[in-house]
Amino acid sequence: MTEGPLSARVQREQDAFNDGLQRDGYMRLFEHTSHLFLQRRARIVQNELKHAQDKNVLELGSISWKSWIEDNGIKPRNLYCINISQEEINLGKESEHLSKVKPHFILMDAHNLDFEDDSFDFVYGCAILHHLDYSRALDEIYRVLKPGGKILFAEPLGINPIAKLVRVMTPFARTIDEKPLMFKELLELEKKFNTSHYYEEFLSVPLGVISGIFFNNPNNWLTRLAFNLDLSLNRMFPFLRYLFRHVLIVGTRK
């Protein structure tokens, strides 16, 4: 484990995830806002993870391998799933006995990856980078990734002022140290990787919450309208994309 102030942060994150976060109600609130974008994300993830077939792959985290790797029919040569929380590793292992993919689960600090340089062809994670010391984590990802290797990360953005307010009002759904990505983090990523960004949820947030009041099905005319408006706004007014709720990052190591 890392030493000094960073080790204290790692310990807080470990304790928070071992104890469990209160996210069920929070996630239900945003079920309608994210539904169609999660479908789009799944298609992009499926396409990008073809590059992980029969390759050495690392997940920062221990949960997403089931939906991203196993359910997409990807069979890596080796798949390592690392997490600082034993409880999260235990959750990840629950699907292992039914899986054709057999991940290696390791209790490990993502700030100090216990792998040799250039070990992996593909590194991915879902909602993990914003829990880490971002610069340190990127350095480690870059180090263990082979030249030309791929990355794939889904992360929250923290630029929208309303999103900042929501985060302040829901401390029970997050850890003390987590920090959604800002301009600085997006720019830092470009120094090490050639990237494409897929932005998710802008008008889909308020209209999705409203649709949840009137519709049980998250795929309804209001969420479809919001989804298409968001795609149009992202295309026509690029400066607005930074106000979206999430971003899916696809990249190649420089």
Residue positions per predicted region:
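Conserved class I S-adenosyl-L-methionine
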Residues: M1-A52, L152-D177
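Class I SAM-dependent methyltransferase SAM/SAH-binding core
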Residues: L58-N112
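A conserved beta-strand element that flanks and buttresses the S-adenosyl-L-methionine
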Residues: Y124
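A short His-aromatic
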Residues: A127-H131
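A short glycine-rich, Lys/Arg-flanked "PGG" loop and its adjoining helix->strand segment in the class I
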Residues: R136-K150
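Short alpha-helix
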Residues: E178-Y198
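A C-terminal cap/extension of S-adenosyl-L-methionine-dependent methyltransferases
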Residues: Y199-K254
